[in-house]
Amino acid sequence: MSGRSLGWVAGTAAAVLVAAGAITYAVAQDGGGPPARTPDAKSADAGFARDMAVHHQQAVEMSYIVRDRTKDEEVRRLAYDIAQTQANQRGMLLGWLDLWGLPKVSADPPMTWMGMRGMPPGEDGALMPGMATNTELKKLQSLDGKQAEVFYLQLMTEHHKGGIHMAEGCADKCAVGAEKRLAQGMVDAQQSEIELMAGMLKERGAHPRS
Protein backbone atom coordinates (compact mmCIF):
# COMPACT_ATOMS: atom_id res chain seq x y z
CA MET A 1 0.00 0.00 0.00
CA SER A 2 1.34 3.43 -0.87
CA GLY A 3 2.34 6.11 1.60
CA ARG A 4 -0.35 8.27 0.07
CA SER A 5 -3.05 5.72 1.03
CA LEU A 6 -1.71 5.40 4.54
CA GLY A 7 -1.59 9.15 4.84
CA TRP A 8 -5.21 9.38 3.76
CA VAL A 9 -6.29 6.91 6.44
CA ALA A 10 -4.29 8.71 9.12
CA GLY A 11 -5.67 12.04 7.97
CA THR A 12 -9.22 10.76 8.11
CA ALA A 13 -8.71 9.49 11.64
CA ALA A 14 -7.20 12.80 12.70
CA ALA A 15 -10.11 14.72 11.21
CA VAL A 16 -12.58 12.61 13.14
CA LEU A 17 -10.68 13.21 16.37
CA VAL A 18 -10.56 16.97 15.80
CA ALA A 19 -14.28 17.07 15.06
CA ALA A 20 -15.25 14.94 18.03
CA GLY A 21 -15.40 17.71 20.60
CA ALA A 22 -17.40 19.97 18.34
CA ILE A 23 -19.93 17.25 17.56
CA THR A 24 -20.30 16.29 21.22
CA TYR A 25 -21.12 19.90 22.09
CA ALA A 26 -23.34 20.35 19.05
CA VAL A 27 -25.57 17.43 19.96
CA ALA A 28 -26.86 19.38 22.94
CA GLN A 29 -27.91 22.29 20.73
CA ASP A 30 -28.23 20.30 17.47
CA GLY A 31 -26.65 22.74 15.10
CA GLY A 32 -26.93 25.97 17.06
CA GLY A 33 -30.71 26.17 17.11
CA PRO A 34 -33.05 25.52 20.02
CA PRO A 35 -32.06 22.58 22.22
CA ALA A 36 -33.03 19.28 20.60
CA ARG A 37 -35.72 17.18 22.24
CA THR A 38 -34.04 14.54 24.40
CA PRO A 39 -34.40 11.09 22.83
CA ASP A 40 -36.13 8.41 24.90
CA ALA A 41 -34.64 5.04 25.81
CA LYS A 42 -36.39 3.21 22.95
CA SER A 43 -35.54 5.75 20.26
CA ALA A 44 -33.34 5.01 17.27
CA ASP A 45 -30.89 7.60 18.62
CA ALA A 46 -30.43 5.73 21.90
CA GLY A 47 -30.49 2.29 20.28
CA PHE A 48 -27.83 3.22 17.75
CA ALA A 49 -25.62 4.79 20.42
CA ARG A 50 -25.82 1.68 22.60
CA ASP A 51 -25.38 -0.88 19.84
CA MET A 52 -22.66 0.93 17.92
CA ALA A 53 -20.68 1.43 21.13
CA VAL A 54 -20.60 -2.36 21.52
CA HIS A 55 -19.85 -2.87 17.82
CA HIS A 56 -16.98 -0.37 17.94
CA GLN A 57 -15.50 -1.96 21.05
CA GLN A 58 -14.90 -5.19 19.16
CA ALA A 59 -13.21 -3.33 16.30
CA VAL A 60 -10.86 -1.74 18.83
CA GLU A 61 -10.15 -5.15 20.38
CA MET A 62 -9.40 -6.80 17.03
CA SER A 63 -7.14 -3.93 16.00
CA TYR A 64 -5.00 -4.17 19.12
CA ILE A 65 -4.79 -7.95 18.76
CA VAL A 66 -3.35 -7.73 15.24
CA ARG A 67 -0.86 -5.04 16.24
CA ASP A 68 0.65 -7.61 18.61
CA ARG A 69 0.65 -10.37 15.97
CA THR A 70 2.46 -8.68 13.07
CA LYS A 71 5.37 -6.36 12.39
CA ASP A 72 3.93 -5.16 9.07
CA GLU A 73 3.78 -1.38 9.35
CA GLU A 74 0.92 -0.97 6.85
CA VAL A 75 -1.39 -3.23 8.82
CA ARG A 76 -0.22 -1.92 12.19
CA ARG A 77 -0.87 1.68 11.14
CA LEU A 78 -4.30 0.88 9.71
CA ALA A 79 -5.20 -1.05 12.86
CA TYR A 80 -4.05 1.85 15.03
CA ASP A 81 -6.08 4.35 13.03
CA ILE A 82 -9.21 2.18 13.23
CA ALA A 83 -8.73 1.62 16.97
CA GLN A 84 -8.24 5.31 17.72
CA THR A 85 -11.12 6.48 15.53
CA GLN A 86 -13.61 3.94 16.81
CA ALA A 87 -12.57 4.30 20.46
CA ASN A 88 -13.13 8.05 20.13
CA GLN A 89 -16.51 7.60 18.45
CA ARG A 90 -17.49 5.04 21.10
CA GLY A 91 -16.73 7.61 23.79
CA MET A 92 -18.93 10.13 22.01
CA LEU A 93 -21.84 7.68 21.76
CA LEU A 94 -21.64 6.75 25.43
CA GLY A 95 -21.26 10.43 26.31
CA TRP A 96 -24.46 11.25 24.47
CA LEU A 97 -26.32 8.59 26.45
CA ASP A 98 -25.04 10.23 29.63
CA LEU A 99 -26.06 13.64 28.30
CA TRP A 100 -29.56 12.34 27.59
CA GLY A 101 -29.79 10.61 30.98
CA LEU A 102 -30.31 7.21 29.33
CA PRO A 103 -28.96 3.77 30.28
CA LYS A 104 -26.04 2.29 28.36
CA VAL A 105 -27.67 -1.14 28.30
CA SER A 106 -31.18 -2.23 27.34
CA ALA A 107 -33.40 -5.22 28.00
CA ASP A 108 -34.34 -5.17 24.32
CA PRO A 109 -32.34 -7.38 21.92
CA PRO A 110 -29.65 -5.64 19.83
CA MET A 111 -30.90 -3.97 16.64
CA THR A 112 -34.47 -3.60 17.96
CA TRP A 113 -34.28 0.12 17.09
CA MET A 114 -33.86 -0.88 13.41
CA GLY A 115 -37.03 -2.95 13.49
CA MET A 116 -35.04 -6.19 13.75
CA ARG A 117 -36.67 -7.52 16.93
CA GLY A 118 -37.08 -10.91 15.29
CA MET A 119 -33.36 -11.17 14.53
CA PRO A 120 -32.02 -14.55 15.76
CA PRO A 121 -29.66 -14.46 18.77
CA GLY A 122 -26.04 -13.77 17.90
CA GLU A 123 -23.96 -16.86 17.20
CA ASP A 124 -20.98 -17.46 19.49
CA GLY A 125 -20.87 -13.88 20.77
CA ALA A 126 -21.56 -12.15 17.44
CA LEU A 127 -24.37 -9.93 18.70
CA MET A 128 -24.78 -7.69 15.66
CA PRO A 129 -24.18 -7.65 11.89
CA GLY A 130 -20.53 -8.07 10.95
CA MET A 131 -19.29 -8.88 14.43
CA ALA A 132 -16.69 -11.63 14.77
CA THR A 133 -17.52 -14.70 16.82
CA ASN A 134 -15.62 -15.63 19.96
CA THR A 135 -14.07 -18.50 18.01
CA GLU A 136 -12.84 -16.10 15.32
CA LEU A 137 -11.31 -13.79 17.92
CA LYS A 138 -9.45 -16.72 19.48
CA LYS A 139 -8.21 -17.73 16.03
CA LEU A 140 -6.93 -14.20 15.37
CA GLN A 141 -5.04 -14.33 18.67
CA SER A 142 -3.40 -17.59 17.59
CA LEU A 143 -2.07 -16.35 14.24
CA ASP A 144 1.12 -14.47 13.40
CA GLY A 145 2.53 -12.49 10.51
CA LYS A 146 0.82 -12.66 7.13
CA GLN A 147 -1.85 -15.10 8.35
CA ALA A 148 -2.85 -12.68 11.12
CA GLU A 149 -2.86 -9.76 8.68
CA VAL A 150 -5.12 -11.53 6.18
CA PHE A 151 -7.56 -12.80 8.81
CA TYR A 152 -7.76 -9.37 10.46
CA LEU A 153 -8.43 -7.63 7.15
CA GLN A 154 -11.14 -10.18 6.33
CA LEU A 155 -12.77 -9.85 9.75
CA MET A 156 -12.60 -6.05 9.69
CA THR A 157 -14.06 -5.90 6.19
CA GLU A 158 -17.10 -7.85 7.40
CA HIS A 159 -17.21 -5.76 10.58
CA HIS A 160 -17.26 -2.55 8.54
CA LYS A 161 -20.03 -3.89 6.29
CA GLY A 162 -22.16 -4.58 9.36
CA GLY A 163 -21.29 -1.19 10.81
CA ILE A 164 -22.30 0.54 7.59
CA HIS A 165 -25.68 -1.22 7.70
CA MET A 166 -26.24 0.06 11.24
CA ALA A 167 -25.00 3.59 10.49
CA GLU A 168 -27.25 3.83 7.44
CA GLY A 169 -30.13 2.88 9.74
CA CYS A 170 -29.31 5.78 12.06
CA ALA A 171 -28.85 8.20 9.18
CA ASP A 172 -32.40 7.27 8.16
CA LYS A 173 -34.13 6.85 11.54
CA CYS A 174 -32.28 8.97 14.12
CA ALA A 175 -33.73 12.37 15.02
CA VAL A 176 -30.69 14.17 16.48
CA GLY A 177 -28.94 15.98 13.66
CA ALA A 178 -25.41 15.63 15.03
CA GLU A 179 -25.84 11.89 15.48
CA LYS A 180 -27.23 11.50 11.95
CA ARG A 181 -24.20 13.37 10.61
CA LEU A 182 -21.80 11.20 12.61
CA ALA A 183 -23.54 8.08 11.29
CA GLN A 184 -23.23 9.26 7.70
CA GLY A 185 -19.57 10.03 8.31
CA MET A 186 -19.11 6.46 9.52
CA VAL A 187 -20.70 5.16 6.32
CA ASP A 188 -18.40 7.21 4.11
CA ALA A 189 -15.19 6.49 6.05
CA GLN A 190 -15.79 2.77 6.49
CA GLN A 191 -16.71 2.28 2.84
CA SER A 192 -13.38 3.88 1.89
CA GLU A 193 -11.57 1.62 4.36
CA ILE A 194 -13.29 -1.45 2.88
CA GLU A 195 -11.87 -0.49 -0.51
CA LEU A 196 -8.45 0.09 1.04
CA MET A 197 -8.52 -3.31 2.80
CA ALA A 198 -9.53 -5.04 -0.44
CA GLY A 199 -6.34 -3.73 -1.99
CA MET A 200 -4.27 -4.83 1.00
CA LEU A 201 -5.78 -8.32 0.81
CA LYS A 202 -4.99 -8.51 -2.90
CA GLU A 203 -1.38 -7.58 -2.19
CA ARG A 204 -1.26 -10.57 0.16
CA GLY A 205 -2.81 -13.00 -2.33
CA ALA A 206 -6.15 -13.06 -0.53
CA HIS A 207 -9.64 -11.60 -0.84
CA PRO A 208 -12.63 -10.71 1.36
CA ARG A 209 -14.62 -13.70 2.63
CA SER A 210 -17.89 -12.27 1.32
For each feature predicted by the language model, list its residue ranges.
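All-alpha RGS (Regulator of G-protein Signaling) helical domain and cognate RGS-like helical scaffolds
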Residues: 2-210
